[in-house]
Curated annotation (Swiss-Prot):
It is a peripheral membrane protein. GO terms for cellular component: cyanelle thylakoid membrane; extrinsic component of membrane; photosystem II. This is Photosystem II extrinsic protein U, cyanelle. It comes from the Eukaryota. It comes from Cyanophora paradoxa. Might be translocated into the thylakoid lumen by the Tat system. The position of the transit peptide cleavages have not been experimentally proven. The lineage of its organism: Eukaryota, Glaucocystophyceae, Cyanophoraceae, Cyanophora. It is found in: Plastid, Cyanelle thylakoid membrane. Its main location: plastid. One of the extrinsic, lumenal subunits of photosystem II (PSII). PSII is a light-driven water plastoquinone oxidoreductase, using light energy to abstract electrons from H(2)O, generating a proton gradient subsequently used for ATP formation. The extrinsic proteins stabilize the structure of photosystem II oxygen-evolving complex (OEC), the ion environment of oxygen evolution and protect the OEC against heat-induced inactivation. Keywords: Cyanelle, Electron transport, Membrane, Photosynthesis, Photosystem II, Plastid, Thylakoid, Transit peptide, Transport. SUPFAM superfamilies: PsbU/PolX domain-like.
């Protein structure tokens, strides 16, 4: 409010008045009071936005600085079959990029496998809506797959893990 008091009344204009080109001196006292209130309200709104952005930034910085924010739990770190070894692929937790390394599996069969997870056994893959040619391709790699216990921490990135070539 002290900021508003230090501004000459001639320069304070509301958006409507600036369109008409009228300053506060040319207005009635009640209109001048309303215009001053509008300016104060706008200043308070900007102050509120600045405080919100500052608080949100501080919260984000605290979260981003925390090593636990992006780390999997200790149990998740021991999950195998995520694609490092193509002869041992966990169909419940492997990312779609793993299937790119298996000719004929990507993109159609891979999307169906990931979309239908979790599975109790590899045999459940044949209950997916696959053509005979796709089932033949699946049989080709069947010995490379196993149905591990689904890990919630890995489920969110099964289609796009954010790692690009």
């Amino acid at each position: 409010m002290a900021f508003v008091a230090s501004i000459p009344a001639v320069r304070i204009q509301t958006s409507l008045q600036s369109l008409k080109g009228e300053s506060l001196k040319a207005q009635k006292p009640a209109a001048a009071k309303q215009a001053a209130f509008t300016v104060v309200a706008q200043a308070e709104e900007k102050k509120g936005r600045r405080e919100f952005v500052a608080a949100a930034g501080a919260l984000f910085a605290a979260f981003a600085a925390s090593p636990a924010a992006f780390a999997y739990s200790a149990a998740d770190a021991n999950v195998t079959g995520l694609g490092g070894d193509l002869s041992n692929i966990d169909i419940n937790n492997a990312n779609i990029a793993v299937y790119q390394k298996l000719p004929g599996m990507y993109p159609n069969i891979a999307k169906k496998i990931i979309g239908g997870a979790p599975y109790k056994s590899v045999a459940e893959l044949y209950s997916l809506d696959l053509s005979e040619k796709q089932k033949e391709t699946l049989r080709k790699y069947e010995d490379n797959f196993y149905a591990g216990e689904p890990v919630d921490a890995l489920g969110f990135d099964s289609i796009n893990n954010g790692i690009y070539k």
